[in-house]
């Protein structure tokens, strides 16, 4: 009986975490001074994107290959009908 309770608790926690993760998306719209470096100097745009990162070389003195940031999805509106 104890194993079933533990199993149910683990299942509930896993489902809760997965639903929270689905509520977020990532964006490459990051202020240049807030970028967290994701690559080494000289990384190409394709190498950067292969790592799952963003590439923007339009601003000097900041990382060109950087991690995207998570943004919350707006809550879905319920259909009134």
UniProtKB/Swiss-Prot annotation:
Keywords: Disulfide bond, Growth factor, Secreted, Signal
InterPro entries (UniProt xref): P_trefoil_chordata (IPR017994), P_trefoil_CS (IPR017957), P_trefoil_dom (IPR000519), P_trefoil_dom_sf (IPR044913)
Superkingdom in the source lineage: Eukaryota
Disulfide bridge positions per record: 28-54, 38-53, 48-65
Gene3D superfamilies, alphabetized: Spasmolytic Protein, domain 1 (4.10.110.10)
Subcellular location: Secreted
Any one biological process term the GO annotation gives: maintenance of gastrointestinal epithelium
Domain P-type: 26-69
Main location: secreted
UniProt GO molecular function: growth factor activity
Cleavable signal peptide: 1-23
CDD domains: Trefoil (cd00111)
GO cellular component: extracellular space
PANTHER family: INTESTINAL TREFOIL FACTOR-RELATED (PTHR13826), TREFOIL FACTOR 1 (PTHR13826:SF18)
Function summary: Stabilizer of the mucous gel overlying the gastrointestinal mucosa that provides a physical barrier against various noxious agents.
Name of the featured protein: Trefoil factor 1
Organism name: Canis lupus familiaris (Dog)
